[in-house]
Amino acid sequence: MAGQTFLHRIGTDLVHIPRIEGMLERYGKQFLNRVYTEGEQHYCLASKPHRANRLAGRWAAKEAVTKALGTGWRGVGYRDIEVVRLASGEPTICLNGRAVLLVERFGRLDWQVSFSHDREYAVATVSVIGFF
């Protein structure tokens, strides 16, 4: 875009799905409420055969966001980063709460999210373009 400064960053994270299954079995709703928004829980738990895969993918996406932004988790909670689905079904990122403070300097953020699952692993790659 002519006349605009932008930054393009990418983050990726890999999650062992049985780890998420174990946390879900051990901590149940407490785990879900600590990590996932109500919308994420609704989507992930709607498909019992795929719920651990979906939860693991969203965990990976949240981690990938912090890597793409280069901020780590400094003062940001898991629920401050939310994976939402557009009307098209495409996943994207919505920042809430303290995560918004990390990106104040950008006028606009464009997100791309990609998930993949293979047996016991879920991976998410997040691309963000920030316009100043």
UniProtKB/Swiss-Prot annotation:
Protein localization: Cytoplasm
Main location: cytoplasm
Entries under Pfam families matching the protein: ACPS
Source species, domain of life: Bacteria
Essential cofactor(s): Mg(2+)
Catalytic activity as recorded in UniProt: apo-[ACP] + CoA = holo-[ACP] + adenosine 3',5'-bisphosphate + H(+)
Positions of Mg(2+) binding: 13, 63
InterPro entries the UniProt entry points to: 4-PPantetheinyl_Trfase_dom, 4-PPantetheinyl_Trfase_dom_sf, ACPS, Ppantetheine-prot_Trfase_dom
Main EC class the enzyme belongs to: transferase
GO MF assignments: holo-[acyl-carrier-protein] synthase activity; magnesium ion binding
GO biological process: fatty acid biosynthetic process
Role this protein plays: Transfers the 4'-phosphopantetheine moiety from coenzyme A to a Ser of acyl-carrier-protein.
UniProt similarity note: Belongs to the P-Pant transferase superfamily. AcpS family.
Protein's UniProt name: Holo-[acyl-carrier-protein] synthase
Gene (name only): acpS
